[in-house]
């Protein structure tokens, strides 16, 4: 009788060991094929050779210029306030494939670099600066599979400014150097129109400054 109980216990241990081996095999298979139960995948997904997608974006940003110094308020060569600007952006970014485990863990995070041209409608006194920057963004909230609220920050350098000059540009108390730092942060709605196209709309804040490395440096904020 004791011998039979020992055999039954041994058989039960073997069954448990087989179950553990099966679970381990499923986990290894899921890791190789990017399918994880804890991320909501019910079945094993097909193997995907590329874990990232690459994106190209074009943005148009009409901007309001905050009148933070006399030059922008109208004390300039034209005696007119500088109240608006416009920036065109070309951007490249990459991110994890949508609806994968990594995409859900990191909230749709993406990163990349961009190139922008900004005009203030006064090339003689301010110039039309060109900006190169890096950026990063992610999802804040998802309202449905196609619509989400996202954030993004940009950081880079802008060149092509017309700085203060005692003889030729003496009114410009906003910009003291030809190259300035570029800082930007914003939030926007992202609407996925199709597999290949997204439409975004939102607002942001931009600051141009040289960090007081050269004066005057009142800066420009939009």
Task: For every predicted segment, state its role.
Residues 52, 82-88, 126-132, 177-183, ...:
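Residues that define the transmembrane beta-barrel architecture of outer-membrane proteins
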Residues 74-79, 120-123, 169-175, 211-218:
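Extracellular loop and loop/strand-boundary signature of outer-membrane beta-barrel proteins
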Residues 60-66, 94, 115-121, 155-163, ...:
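Transmembrane beta-strands of outer-membrane beta-barrel pores
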